[in-house]
Amino acid sequence: MSMTVEQMTKVFRLVMDDVELNRLLYYKTDPLSPSHPDVQSLENYYDSTNDSPAIINTIFKRAPKTDDLSDSPLCRMCIYLGNALPKPTNQSFMLLNQELMIDVYTHINTFEISEYRSLKIIDRVSKLFFNKNIAGFGVTVDYKRLLISNPPDGYLGYKMIFTFGASK
């Protein structure tokens, strides 16, 4: 497995294993309530059932996939690599600034009218990634949050861009 694939697998595993983040993405009401079981413990978290796909495949994507969001109201997180630009030669010709892109989509009528669910998700992701050494990429050197200008109908979208130092 290539080093980049291994690092992205670790990043994906970090968000996939986070209990609070899964609750924020999955449960429609009162996601952090102790009355809800952890999402990862649900029978169809990893495996699809006859009538629905696996939860993990619905709320997490490894690419910016949104063409299926109009089917039902949900929250989704897309995680993928962005640009990798060389650092100035006076810093090191062997290092890059690697962008990690995380898109967060929330259905407006279901999640944004009664609470700021997208902001809660963004805050949780920031706690997981900001100023941390993640999956061998290095420590975050820059962070941006941008509004996605053309989200799917009925959705609010934010793009989080974490820039890490990485080796070539």
From Swiss-Prot:
Protein name (Swiss-Prot/TrEMBL): SPbeta prophage-derived uncharacterized protein YomW
Species in which this protein is naturally found: Bacillus subtilis (strain 168)
Organism placement in taxonomy: Bacteria, Bacillati, Bacillota, Bacilli, Bacillales
Name of the gene encoding the protein in the UniProt record: yomW
